[in-house]
């Protein structure tokens, strides 16, 4: 989460009203989700999708959110084998 006034957005952004209070902001050319806003849930902040940041490593994770709806097996992801890309394509 970032304070809305401290984030610079470059380029055109489209908005989809996904609920009464929620807004999903995305690239109008390719459809990539960029960030989510909800003045009712977290006023003055934006929930940026980490893969869209220029330098995501500069912002380490501080918490997990929406865990009430998490798929059961997601809690054990750290215990699974890891592959840089796809299995067998090292």
Where are these regions (language model features)?
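A short Gly-Trp-Pro
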Residues: 1-90
